[in-house]
Amino acid sequence: MKPKQLIFHDAARGKIWRGVEALAEAVKVTLGPRGRTVILERDFGPPQIVNSGVLVAKSIELEDRFENMGAQLLREVAARTSEMAGDGTTTATVLAHGMIQEGLRYLAGGMNPMDLKRGIELAIDTVVAELQRMAKPCASSQEIAHVAAISANNDRSIGDLLASAIDKVGREGAISIEDGSGLVSVLEVVEGMQFDRGFLSPYFINNAERQSAVLEDVSILLCEGRLTSLNDLLPLLEEVVKAGRPLLVIAEDVDSDSLAALVINTMRGTLKTCAVKAPGFGDRRKAMVQDIAVLTGGTVVSDEVGLTLGKVRLQDLGRATRAEITKESTTLIGGAGKPQAIRDRIATIRKERELAASDYDREKLDERAAKLSGGVALIKVGAATETELKERKLRVEDALHATRAAVEEGIVPGGGVALLRARRTLAGLTGGTLDETSGIRLVSRALEEPLRRIVSNAGDEPSVILNRVDESPDPAFGYNAATRAYGDLLQMGVIDPAKVTRLALQNAASIASLILTTDCMIATAPKPSSEEGALNPEGSSPMF
């Protein structure tokens, strides 16, 4: 076991703070409509220009091990917010930085960190409840376009493109983002389907940047039950290899031997393949697998129809022009099913809906019909250079996640104003002790930070604008940093998804609470250059 270096108390918190400060300063410059870009060095190729907080955070590694731990803890805020909401990473980082900064001041004054933590939790619960009360449904295409544009760094063309895509495939429809071949981004709608099942092994990933498996001109094996016989599967794999097509396996489950065979073939480059579990449960799973079969022109492997795995041939497989599989979902584009068969299947589902006894069954049948009829919207992102294309694709992806969140939980005024209005509920709130009340005040002060930073990045004076916005009784009144004008932010189209704002706040508070209750740090000790180097630089502890 390698020797360890330990630091405690103020020395540990000082190191954490320096790491947090370094990462936060790099991320904060991207916030708001007038936020700046960051240039990232890459191991290969030209530098990457980004305006995404999570990408900036992921790129930072500090030389000092203890400071780097602080930076990585703050990076976790951005990563978790990105994973859960797809947007709001910079706001979460700014909030966490503000809470940690205020909290460390209180700790330096001798306050109890556990009481501070309880005060933070009480304040966050109160503010979240107020945000949910403030949220309004995202009802119109115009509101969706505004949400998307703001998330895409105030790019109206991206907002309009996403609003158009949602109009065409519905709010639950599948939207896929691809590289375009021209200078202008375009929207296409193709026959396709998306369901919420991802790959069974990360070894299937062949697109590292998007953490997905992409299979072009793919054959699709559909199994109603479990895939348990490796010997029956091998002849089919040989046929698929000869045909030169990738293979997507959709089954109730795949046993370890069969999964291992697919993974090994993928890693060796013998066959591009991927395996996913079939969507749904019980009888609904059977019906959904049959939906996929109709869409792709395949035949389901099922004892009920007398087709076993050993009898399956290439012509029994479904086909699609493209399949994209992530950790959480599978998207099939351009299925080879006959249009009349698809229309007949949709008609059958709608008849079943008329006979359904419960709202839940009707809802699920509506979803199935929508997946078959709505298709998949393809946004082909255009740009002049590869560097611009990557940056623009990231903005489109952020905008898509933001619109999904807005549809799910509604919208609130943007520009940091929603947090400023929600903090009014903290004015009369007190904790059980003085230190708990200080935790509440800590959160109240941190809720100003997103607005302050947006204004600062726009080149204006934060305190002046903060005071004017805070004094207004109108809950939607705020400052539009893009136009440098005051007014009703909802009418001006400066809106944020309530879900993104909520998750940014909750994740920021979670990490801030953990950091404020930390009293010791342990890291692998560097090799000492001499006997005197055996003590750590703080002089707080020898190596163990």
UniProtKB/Swiss-Prot annotation:
GO terms for biological process: protein refolding. HAMAP family: CH60. This is Chaperonin GroEL 1. One of its GO terms (molecular function) is ATP binding. ATP binds at residues 30-33, 87-91, 415, 480-482, 496. Belongs to the chaperonin (HSP60) family. One of its GO terms (cellular component) is cytoplasm. It is found in: Cytoplasm. CDD domains: GroEL. It is an enzyme of class 5 (isomerase).
